[in-house]
Amino acid sequence: MRKRQQSQNEGTPAVSQAPGNQRPNNTCCFCWCCCCSCSCLTVRNEERGENAGRPTHTTKMESIQVLEECQNPTAEEVLSWSQNFDKMMKAPAGRNLFREFLRTEYSEENLLFWLACEDLKKEQNKKVIEEKARMIYEDYISILSPKEVSLDSRVREVINRNLLDPNPHMYEDAQLQIYTLMHRDSFPRFLNSQIYKSFVESTAGSSSES
């Protein structure tokens, strides 16, 4: 009996899996999970090389993380910021300086969220709107995100409803709430910070030299 089984095993060719048919073991089955490293919204390094000629929305959103290009403001303009938060927020140089201060308070995500919402408002392509809306949610609204902004339950409910049919203005309530928070909470401390005072002095010195 043992010899018969041995002869059968010898007669059966071993089935080897071709290298080309092997399934990659880095496949993830949770592509919708915010904390997953292979999220469908994440641009992998190898994909960046293959799609170098095609712009990606992730790259666009990541560009918000970079300080904005701007011209040097005058001393009068910098001083006027202390009287008008709206005016400072409309000036790229003002936003950059305010952002530098927020970073020291570990609340930079508030301004980044506001900028992302402003970027979303400019979009008209429905597919791009859906992708950017989802990315904003994952980056700043989701409780799983380290950059989650502080919003009340009413605003969160509005956002969750809007996610069913995203539109460029779906985060307006949340954006206004964060804008008000920065104005009332962070802005007064910013004006008393060394960052702002030093910038005022430097611009005043530049104006006197010219």
From Swiss-Prot:
Subcellular location: Membrane; Synapse, Synaptosome; Nucleus; Cytoplasm
Positions of post-translational Phosphotyrosine modification: 137
One GO process term, biological-process aspect: negative regulation of signal transduction
Domain of life: Eukaryota
UniProt-annotated stretches for the region Disordered: 1-21
InterPro entries hit by this protein: RGS, RGS_sf, RGS_subdomain_2
Keywords annotated in UniProt: Cytoplasm, Glycoprotein, GTPase activation, Membrane, Nucleus, Phosphoprotein, Signal transduction inhibitor, Synapse, Synaptosome, Ubl conjugation
GO cellular component: cytoplasm; neuron projection; nucleus; plasma membrane; synapse
RGS domain segment(s): 84-200
Cross-referenced PANTHER family: REGULATOR OF G PROTEIN SIGNALING, REGULATOR OF G-PROTEIN SIGNALING 17
Subunit note: Interacts with GNAI1 and GNAQ. Interacts with GNAZ and GNAI2. Interacts with OPRM1. Forms a complex with mu-opioid receptors and G(alpha)z/i2 subunits, including GNAZ and GNAI2; the formation of this complex results in mu-opioid receptor desensitization. Interacts with HINT1.
Function, in words: Regulates G protein-coupled receptor signaling cascades, including signaling via muscarinic acetylcholine receptor CHRM2 and dopamine receptor DRD2. Inhibits signal transduction by increasing the GTPase activity of G protein alpha subunits, thereby driving them into their inactive GDP-bound form. Binds selectively to GNAZ and GNAI2 subunits, accelerates their GTPase activity and regulates their signaling activities. Negatively regulates mu-opioid receptor-mediated activation of the G-proteins.
The protein, known as: Regulator of G-protein signaling 17
